Amino acid sequence: MKKLVGLVLLAVVFVTTMAITSSTPPTMHTMEGTWELQGFYNFDDQTVTDTVNLPEGYRQVKMYYNGKIMWSRTDPNDTVGRFGFGSYRITNEDLIETIEFGDYQMMQALDTLREFTFELVLKDDTFSQIAFDEDGNRTFSENYKRVD
């Protein structure tokens, strides 16, 4: 009987020790949620050369959920609002958005390009999607803050 109690006690100590010392891998940041555009950066030779603030009244929001994206923009200098809907995926370095439909102007643009690939810099409450030219040089970024 003493041996059985000793074995059970040893097993409990072992399991408890393993549970305490086992480390879980850090979780990846997630795109899921609602994000609002804060401003833009312009790049030259991979370096930020200019920060562009949003004009008064300009708002752009992106919502990512379950592999889908929806975005909307309003600009007081443009009487036509903009929106788009599609799917997205992220890799270690990229955000790939495939737009399925949107407003009239977006649908016109979709005749030539439906998939948009950006360099992704993702943190807990901010992200930047960085566009690049055909040579792989950064050109500009949209910078977002999580609102939900």
PLM regions and their residue ranges:
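Positively charged n-region of N-terminal signal peptides that target proteins for export
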Residues: 1-4
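Lipid interaction determinants
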Residues: 6, 15-83, 96-148
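Repetitive helical segments and hydrophobic/amphipathic motifs
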Residues: 11-12
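Phosphoinositide-binding peripheral membrane targeting modules
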Residues: 86
